[in-house]
């Protein structure tokens, strides 16, 4: 699958034209503000970026990268959504995460030089790929980029630890509640309503991620609906009383995986009042 061209490839250049092209590519993105918390847009604020930057497009069901493929770049989700999945030797598959616009993925390949999971588009998706070695070189020269790179890696570790807690210590209802609250925060981080959003993933994918069956996911959603906590219309979820939902499942509220800034933080806080 060929990357979707932006304007032209940028590789090891310091020219003013190249800097302008790279900056324009991010400025034209509707999610440029959402990417600032992720850190990658800081690259374009530096005077002399040395980057290889490309945009990729995947249709629903297409692979962004596979387990075992060489690691070359990290990806910022520009639009759409993806899932990452691990496959055991016997063929069993476990969904390991969901990736939304403004978020960064791909760090699973840093340690071994090869990706440890397969990432698939849940819907038509665009990502911006940043070559890792030039990014690492830039981070050694620019403390702000280095700090954000470390924070992104730390976030990946924190997410993995949270998922271990999710699967090992919570009931099925708490697991689903934790995921819904997480998706609510992530919607707020993108500037959307924290009380109404689409589930980009199927019930089967949700069940795989939570370690329960798709039937259990459907039953729990019906239970939340019967309790007048939320409405579910196919993939559309609307919280009827988000503060009450958060209070009932208070054990899940302490985890804030999406770093909220400014208006997004205020939006999430108001939704819980």
Predicted regions and their residues:
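Cyclic-nucleotide recognition modules
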Residues: 97-162
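Cyclic nucleotide-binding regulatory module and flanking cytosolic helices
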Residues: 2-60, 104-105, 110-111
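Phosphate-/nucleic-acid-contacting segments
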Residues: 185-273
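A secondary-structure boundary/capping signal
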Residues: 60, 100-101, 131, 153, ...
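Short aromatic/basic micro-patch
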Residues: 55, 74, 98, 129, ...
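Polybasic "coupling" helices that flank or enter modular domains
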Residues: 140-213
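Alpha-helix/helix-capping structural signal
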Residues: 79, 133-134, 155, 204, ...
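Cyclic nucleotide-binding regulatory domains
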Residues: 37, 46-47, 60-124
């Amino acid at each position: 699958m060929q990357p979707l061209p932006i304007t032209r490839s940028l590789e090891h250049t310091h020219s003013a034209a190249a800097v302008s092209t790279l900056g324009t590519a991010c400025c034209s993105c509707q999610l440029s503000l959402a990417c600032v918390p992720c850190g990658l847009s800081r690259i374009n604020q530096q005077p002399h970026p040395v980057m290889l930057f490309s945009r990729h497009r995947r249709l629903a069901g297409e692979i962004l990268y596979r387990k075992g493929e060489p690691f070359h770049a990290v990806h910022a989700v520009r639009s759409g959504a993806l899932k990452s999945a691990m496959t055991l030797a016997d063929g069993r598959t476990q969904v390991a995460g969901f990736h939304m616009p403004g978020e960064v993925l791909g760090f699973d390949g840093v340690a071994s030089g090869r990706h440890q999971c397969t990432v698939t588009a849940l819907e038509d998706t665009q990502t911006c790929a940043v070559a890792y070695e030039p990014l690492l070189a830039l981070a050694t020269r620019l403390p702000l980029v280095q700090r954000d790179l470390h924070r992104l890696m730390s976030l990946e570790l924190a997410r993995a630890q949270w998922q271990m807690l999710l699967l090992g210590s919570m009931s099925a209802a708490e697991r689903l509640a934790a995921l819904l609250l997480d998706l609510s925060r992530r919607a707020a981080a993108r500037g959307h309503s924290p009380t109404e959003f689409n589930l980009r993933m199927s019930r089967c994918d949700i069940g795989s991620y939570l370690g329960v069956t798709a039937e259990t996911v459907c039953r729990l959603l019906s239970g939340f609906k019967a309790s007048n906590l939320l409405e579910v219309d196919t993939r559309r979820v609307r919280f009827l009383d988000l503060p009450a939902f958060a209070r009932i499942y208070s054990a899940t509220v302490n985890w804030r995986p999406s770093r909220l800034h400014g208006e997004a933080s205020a939006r999430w806080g108001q939704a819980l009042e």
